[in-house]
């Protein structure tokens, strides 16, 4: 842990952005944060100022991403079918299996230096899940966890009806995180039929829109989620920038 912790966070809303472009950007922030941490070691302890943190909100055009522990066969369509669906495909460096991102899904990439908070990846994941659960409660949706599975679920205590509403997958090095979560607000859920989501073949997926049978404001979801992340991690929000 840093002696002088820094819980400031710069929030950036990138809007709809190409997956590769967002991946490159968060990688840049991730690497820069690690470099700043390493540079601190050469300074006297009382002069060390911990690097700040970043939180990216965005949506992506249709894309499937496969994590390091995933299986290529969990993508159930061919290259030609991918092109017909106007969807991209990437094999990436986060944990987890395959998932889908698309318009109407809120993607969050926290680039947090956990030395500013707590050095426990499992606790970090549970905090992210809790922020999602509290956000869904703001829309009168009851959500929870399933033991042994990362993410957030509706009717999590009913194996026959449990359905996933938020997927998660992260990478961490020197306690700096990247990648994050994908909350289904109102995406086209038919795209999930082309994969075995997160490598789990016996659970359905859902969205806020499907659960409520009505559309909701993406901005409202972001606002609630930021409120809960701020409270859980005791963040100090520097400012929020929007890219259109």
Swiss-Prot record:
Residues that, per the record, bind substrate: 94-101, 167-169, 180-182
Keywords: Acyltransferase, Cytoplasm, Transferase
Pfam families in the cross-refs: LplA-B_cat
Annotated SUPFAM superfamilies: Class II aaRS and biotin synthetases
GO BP, sorted A to Z: protein modification process
Subcellular localization: Cytoplasm
Pathway: Protein modification; protein lipoylation via endogenous pathway; protein N(6)-(lipoyl)lysine from octanoyl-[acyl-carrier-protein]: step 1/2
Similarity comment: family membership: Belongs to the LipB family.
Further remark: In the reaction, the free carboxyl group of octanoic acid is attached via an amide linkage to the epsilon-amino group of a specific lysine residue of lipoyl domains of lipoate-dependent enzymes.
Listed name of the protein: Octanoyltransferase
């Amino acid at each position: 842990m840093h002696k002088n912790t820094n819980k400031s966070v710069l929030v950036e809303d990138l809007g709809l952005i190409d997956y590769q472009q967002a991946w490159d950007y968060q990688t840049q922030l991730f690497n820069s944060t690690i470099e700043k941490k390493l540079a601190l070691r050469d300074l006297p302890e009382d002069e060390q100022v911990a690097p700040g943190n970043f939180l990216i909100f965005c949506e992506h055009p249709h894309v499937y991403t496969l994590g390091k522990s995933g299986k290529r066969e969990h993508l159930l369509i061919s290259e030609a079918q991918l092109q017909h669906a106007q969807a991209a495909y990437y094999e990436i460096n986060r944990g987890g299996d395959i998932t889908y991102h698309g318009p109407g899904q809120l993607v969050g990439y926290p680039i947090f230096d956990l030395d500013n908070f707590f050095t426990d990846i499992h606790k970090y994941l549970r905090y992210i899940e809790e922020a999602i659960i509290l956000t869904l409660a703001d829309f009168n949706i009851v959500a929870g966890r399933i033991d042994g599975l990362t993410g957030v679920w509706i009717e999590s205590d009913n194996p026959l009806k449990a359905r996933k509403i938020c997927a998660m997958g992260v990478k961490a090095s020197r306690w700096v995180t990247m990648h994050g979560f994908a909350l289904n607000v109102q995406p086209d859920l038919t795209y999930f039929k082309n994969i075995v989501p997160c490598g789990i073949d016996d659970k359905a997926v859902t969205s806020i829109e499907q659960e409520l049978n009505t559309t909701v404001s993406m901005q409202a979801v972001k606002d609630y989620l930021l409120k809960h992340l701020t409270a859980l991690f005791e963040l100090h929000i520097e400012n929020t920038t929007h890219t259109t």
